[in-house]
Amino acid sequence: MSVLTFPTGTYHFNDHPLFDFQLNRVVMWNHGDPAEIQARGGEITDFPSWERVLKELSAQAEAREDWAAAAGYLRMAEFFMAPDTPECHAAYDRARKIFYTHFTYLFAEQGGPIHREEVPYADGVLPCWRIVPADTSKGAILFHGGNDSLLEEFTDALLYLAQGGYTVLAFEGPGQGAALRKSGLTFTPEWEKPVGAVLDHYGAEDVTIIGVSLGGELCMRAAAMEPRIRRVVSWSVLPSIYGALMADKPAEIRAKLEHWLDENNRDAILDLYAGLAEREPLFRWSIQHSNYAYGTSDVYEYLQKARAFTIEPVAERITQDVLLLSAREDLLVDFGLYKQEIDLLKNTRSLEFAAPGRALNGQAHCNMGNTEYMLDLILNWNDRMLER
């Protein structure tokens, strides 16, 4: 297999920061064409126009048999659709069908490096990929994403890690991908449970875990509880999901919410957010998506559940080598949270922190503008840790 390369840099595709970031994600991780997106990005003003433009770009890519872009555009069209609807499921299923129909050569059945399996978990299954390197493996990397993660989106990154000499075990956990959409498994704060199921299935020991985006919290929680994890890469630094949600809120609002949540005052919280849900489509979508992925029914239940996703009670149990990767202009996670996390990690075997800036195109969430640099950084760090 040829050596993989990744796009670098960031583009201005849309004046709305979140649409602009997600359009850059289409290019960086989903094989979108920047010229096509530049020409159409300004048409996107709301969720219906997002869906329309991305589906049209997918159809155009399919017509020219650019299957990676066709699947990627459609994968991202689903992103802002109302979750758990027939239309949303149809977009997800079609994107997967395009991918698995036209990239069979990547999978073991056709002689490729990816072994596609399902790991039993709770009342469903966790989709897993096991990718084997061409030569003798240096060790195992366990990889998972975050809030809206799909295995297929990470294909190039996972293959790159395997080309670095590692056996890669990648999975969709509860709340993610097909584990959510097909098995109905919702997010659990006890991330060591799905991690343990995957490690048991493969008989894996002495692994490096990589968690991306929200996965940066999840992997740290798993590391605190799972001794088979020996090295941790938190690719987005957030010691708690609730803390990340509250980071940009005024102190008065944070105090009110804390009090109401402690008092189980559902009505006060629902009243506070009712007007916002009516006025702000983005907030409404965010709550719809969160309720679906976390198995909650309203913003009160979601905030209560989000408070359980924190490393604070278990941080002193994290004794592994740890690499924290942050982004200085992160739209989704407050950069300043790294200070709180470092203060919590008192017992790590070692701790390294990296936050590439604009000069390295690493300023955006998950350092989206320079994936290859980040993967090389991770591989070099892991090699060093294994040599100690």
Where are the regions a protein language model picked out?
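N-terminal cap/lid segment of alpha/beta-hydrolase-fold proteins
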Residues: 54, 90-135
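Alpha/beta-hydrolase active-site loop
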Residues: 153, 184-205
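Short alpha-helix in the alpha/beta-hydrolase fold that links the catalytic acid
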Residues: 157, 320, 334-344
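Conserved alpha/beta-hydrolase
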Residues: 161-178
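Hydrolase active-site cap/lid region
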Residues: 224-303
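Short beta-strand/loop motif that positions the catalytic acidic residue
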Residues: 318-319, 324-326, 330
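Catalytic histidine neighborhood in serine/cysteine hydrolases
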Residues: 342-363
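Catalytic active-site module of serine/aspartate enzymes centered on a nucleophile-bearing elbow/loop
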Residues: 356-388
